[in-house]
Swiss-Prot record:
Zinc finger extent (CCHC-type): 393-410, 414-431
GO biological process: DNA integration; DNA recombination; establishment of integrated proviral latency; proteolysis; symbiont entry into host cell; symbiont-mediated activation of host apoptosis; symbiont-mediated suppression of host gene expression; viral genome integration into host DNA
Annotated region described as Interaction with host CALM1, given as residue ranges: 8-43
Binding-site residues for Zn(2+), renumbered to this chain: H1160, H1164, C1188, C1191
Region Interaction with membrane phosphatidylinositol 4,5-bisphosphate and RNA, residue ranges: 14-33
Co-factor note (free text): Binds 2 magnesium ions for reverse transcriptase polymerase activity. Binds 2 magnesium ions for ribonuclease H (RNase H) activity. Substrate-binding is a precondition for magnesium binding.
UniProt-listed CDD domains: HIV_retropepsin_like, RT_Rtv
Residue ranges of domain Peptidase A2 in the record: 509-578
Note: HIV-1 lineages are divided in three main groups, M (for Major), O (for Outlier), and N (for New, or Non-M, Non-O). The vast majority of strains found worldwide belong to the group M. Group O seems to be endemic to and largely confined to Cameroon and neighboring countries in West Central Africa, where these viruses represent a small minority of HIV-1 strains. The group N is represented by a limited number of isolates from Cameroonian persons. The group M is further subdivided in 9 clades or subtypes (A to D, F to H, J and K).
Top-rank lineage group of the source organism: Viruses
Motif Nuclear localization signal mapped to chain: 26-32
Record-given protein name: Gag-Pol polyprotein
The RNase H type-1 domain, residue ranges: 1022-1145
Amino acid sequence: MGARASVLSGGKLDAWEKIRLRPGGRKKYRLKHLVWASRELERFALNPDLLETADGCQQILGQLQPALKTGTEDLQSLYNTIAVLYCVHQRIDVKDTKEALGKIEEIQNKNKQRTQQAPAAADKEKDSKISQNYPIVQNAQGQMVHQAISPRTLNAWVKVVEEKAFSPEVIPMFSALSEGATPQDLNAMLNTVGGHQAAMQMLKDTINEEAAEWDRLHPVHAGPIPPGQMREPRGSDIAGTTSTLQEQVAWMTGNPPIPVGDIYKRWIILGLNKIVRMYSPVSILDIKQGPKEPFRDYVDRFFRVLRAEQATQDVKNWMTDTLLVQNANPDCRTILKALGRGASIEEMMTACQGVGGPSHKARVLAEAMSQVTNASAAIMMQKGNFKGPRRTVKCSNCGKEGHIARNCRAPRKKGCWKCGQEGHQMKDCTGRQANFFRENLAFQQGKAREFPPEEARANSPTSRELRVRRGDHPLSEAGAERTGTSFNFPQITLWQRPIVTVKIEGQLKEALLDTGADDTVLEDINLPGKWKPKMIGGIGGFIKVRQYEQVAIEIFGKKAIGTVLVGPTPVNIIGRNILTQMGCTLNLPISPIETVPVTLKPGMDGPKVKQWPLTEEKIKALTEICLEMEKEGKISKIGPENPYNTPIFAIKKKNSTRWRKLVDFRELNKRTQDFWEVQLGIPHPAGLKKKKSVSVLDVGGAYFSVPLHEDFRKYTAFTIPSTNNETPGIRYQYNVLPQGWKGSPAIFQSSMTKILEPFRKQNPEVIIYQYMDDLYVGSDLEIGQHREKIEELRAHLLRWGFTTPDQKHQKEPPFLWMGYELHPDKWTVQPVKLPEKDSWTVNDIQKLVGKLNWASQIYPGIKVKQLCXLLRGAKALTEIVPLTKEAELELAENREILKEPVHGAYYDPSKELIAEIQKQGPDQWTYQIYQEPFKNLKTGKYAKMRSAHTNDVKQLTEVVQKIATESIVIWGKIPKFRLPIQKETWETWWTEHWQATWIPEWEFVNTPHLVKLWYQLETEPIEGAETYYVDGAANRETKMGKAGYVTDRGKQKIVSLTETTNQKTELQAIYLALQESGPEVNIVTDSQYALGIIQAQPDKSESELVNQIIEELIKKEKFYLSWVPAHKGIGGNEQVDKLVSSGIRKVLFLDGIDKAQVQHEKYHSNWRAMASDFNLPPIVAKEIVASCDKCQLKGEAMHGQVDCSPGIWQLDCTHLEGKIILVAVHVASGYIEAEVIPAETGQETAYFILKLAGRWPVKMIHTDNGSNFTSAAVKAACWWADIHQEFGIPYNPQSQGVVESMNKELKKIIGQVRDQAEHLRTAVQMAVFIHNFKRKGGIGGYSARERIIDIIATDIPTKELQKQISQIQKFRVYYRDSRDPIWKGPAKLLWKGEGAVVIQDNSEIKVVPRRKAKIIRDYGKQMAGDDCVAGRQDED
């Protein structure tokens, strides 16, 4: 009888009773049919409980079907009934029995087909299991074949560059993504990085240098290649420009192999290192907020530089906590200090938004900030599903609402607060049974079940449970604390039917707890009192019952009084009328999914941050919130054995009296392992495939549905304090993912993916896009079937503890998803409304531009250039900006565009992608990506000027790169381009200027604003045209300059300039030559800057002078521009150089000064680096630094670079446990030598230095000005060991930055091993061993020991090579060419071989046979005079 009572309930029962017995008939299925079917199954020896599930019905149908042909009519009726029941369980919409039988037959046929296809699919899968992990794999024939790099990898690389912007993290990410790649794959990765031309040019230069070095070290063997042997790769082959893919695979898989992919990858990483250094040249100490700089911009600069800092994570955390506040401007600093140490970055940015003006404004804001609500950081509370509205708190002592008895200020009422009698307290009152458990309850098992701890529940397989909680009158807090068991509620899981023993008017009965039943119905019980007859809809039809009022019922010691019905019910039922009185709730437990293991960072312990004091109001609010969370199993109480703590606080919700609990997890986040975000971006609707049926779901209480790893829970401990320390604080820890913890997003995404995986496999026809807690579900099923699948998905998620609230379940279009509006056959952005304003502030315009940028992805033609021009310069957010005429016109055009709604189409994989680009006006481009005309998948705009001097072709290539990157991300492939440019113009540009080998597939489209090149540069000198040697010079101090030219026909002209620079004078000289010359001209310059601008063929520029040069170039018929190195004795160049330098240049003519100045302007390198890199005297290198205004910071010490030469050590004394530790650090490697010395004297220090010099090559020591380091003993030791000693800047710890940092690191390690050693000196040596041998990191992932050995080993051959080079460079070579009998020279000797020499003549490197070369020693330029500095500098 039990099975008959619980086969169907709720919505399924309603669906059952709507199905007709026959098509067109009147009779419908009723519960009596299920009762009959249950009895019939018992006759056939089948378990009636199988009727409760779809799988059970399927098993019954499988047993009955073979007997149908020979069975009776009753057997056929039974089969029909179970077939209809199966459809109800599966939520298949049927109207009658015949339709249900048809559906069953259809399902059975599909199952047969799957069974037949399974072996074939298994064979196919076996054949296709080729490794996808590496680009080169072995096929079935044993041949090595290449797999193209996947769009997913390219997408990840593009995201890395876009998000990290060449910060140091880019290099290991590139290395990981390019594992095993061929040069062609590596070029594909480089070509997807479109918007970083300067960085790509640097990378190209590095690759060219490395390729040339490869060719020098691997000369080509003379003679033909033997048959069957491959040629050896040249540098350009390794770079993938002159080799085919087949050759690359053959080299990489040959015997012996030549790993061209790894070699090319190494070159790229060298280039990336240079780029990273260029993008991160600033010290974190220099990052200070300007007086009017927005706080948001300051924070961006701070963290961008912080990521590039070479420091430990602890140091970086300290910098974030202290330097960020210290270096803010005074107004922001006042606010930040008022916020306190608990403030997050988001709170700081909210507080400091728009700050400026007088200091009193900052104080006012700081006071107001105490009431600011940060909704984004608030921790969402997850309520139980069936608890009803939250009850207001009422005092049991005075009877007033708003506080509890524990906090009541009224005189304490005598006696019991429940019954009023004296002699006992409320918790002992017999009228209220506070303790739910007794020694023996009338359970079937004979004992009361205990409520398991939260840890067990979190991993239990239950999908839902019943729990009895407190009644309508809550216990006082004092009572709850005294009883100690008020939260150990009975728990009944629903894996079995919830049948318990209850006491009704003293009689014991077994009854089913049924939250779906309205009334309590019992059978075979005699109750006292009057009754009245009643008819109710029961199991098997209507039944007649007797209704008794005011019946006493007791369950688990809880008493209730209510109405009871007595009649012929198949099972005794306790309905909602009694359960609600007892506080019984239906609870969804924490997800039973497997927890993700989480650890702390190596060597770190959990947070031990003290709880700061809280107001009484906040303590009360937190106590209530935590009680609710504990009931729901999200947190658990802990004892004093847990030593960890994280501070908590509470803030009020905006426009509400309710409170939010916030936990300051910053310290735990610093100590928690790092996580990789499993999703690199949000999905775009243009990449969605068109689906017949769509639904959008939202997962409720997402984080609180996923359990936290059991071993990690202790680190989330927090404490609720008491007012005036009245009682010890209440301690809790989290059982679920906490809000604000760094691991919650990644673990939730990973868990959700695992949960959805089986559903995706079982339902391949259903597409699910998952982003955090938003789910987009699409299919080509009919709407009824689709909704059944949605219900299956919701049920699947519910089984794992994830609820999908009905109010956020979108069933009908349009669907609002991720900021978009989705329709069945089209999509658009959610409606964009532009505000109408008389006056616009900076903040208004920023929001307006953001809206227009968002709308531009589907509304073609939107422009924002003029609006963005209004935001130039550092302006306050509240500053009113007048609109220019151009901006007003642009805004009016955009309003017109947005009036008509525009929709995008969905992606069809069977059709090709087409991208069409149009030029809208000056520096503004729009594009559309579509598959069918007039049905755009996506539109966009481009209006960036990436360089000051550009032209339309260059901008068009940037647009193409942007579209290609977008397409790879969204669709995984590159579209065919339709470009407004002639084929000849396009191909000319790509041939001359593109930095890599990839050219997209494209075709010409004749739309307005055709792109063209306005002038053409000749590639060879023009015969018969006059040659102009041009040059310019300027004095940095006086800003005076000269520009001029000298021609090969004797003409010359020099003009004086004021308020100019070296770069401007070089351009002015070219402009002068263009003005004075005829229609055809050759110009020779020694300026790389000017050459780079003009070779790019710009047709517009931000510089007025460059625009004037462009106008002159357009007038020329032919124009040739060449570059020669400065100060090399080249005739015309040397003449014009002397003319323009007269009275202008102060610095001597030394080879490398110009390059050093250019590099210093870019990188602000120190004088030592320039002296080394460009072979300059120290006095000249220091003069360059001294003349740079950015390197002379007023009122501040100069922050130079740490000298990392191989022989430099920093020494310092530090103190621990009252003893002195002398520490020496090898600056370049971080290797440590340390000892405990008896006294801080010169003698002990000198002995330590000599011992250090006996172990390692020490050339220089850098110390502070302590008396022991300045002593005569130390000076004597340094003199004897030939060690140079330098001293730091007094009272400036940064001058000893390396050793100071290592002191902290050493002390930290000593603290970790101190309990293992009896004496401090032992612990110091243990810590030194750990640091040098057991800690790896930095470049290459080496330990300090490996790094110092590698540095010394590399330094020895480098010095030997330098000796050989210096010997060779003392010689000069005079030589003859094969056809020219005249001797040329002198040239530099680079290498001398048996049969030939390699020489450098000017900038050209040549190979000359020994018989045609004369090698002589160079004795200097005697003609120039002995004291000619210029002459001496030309000697190498």
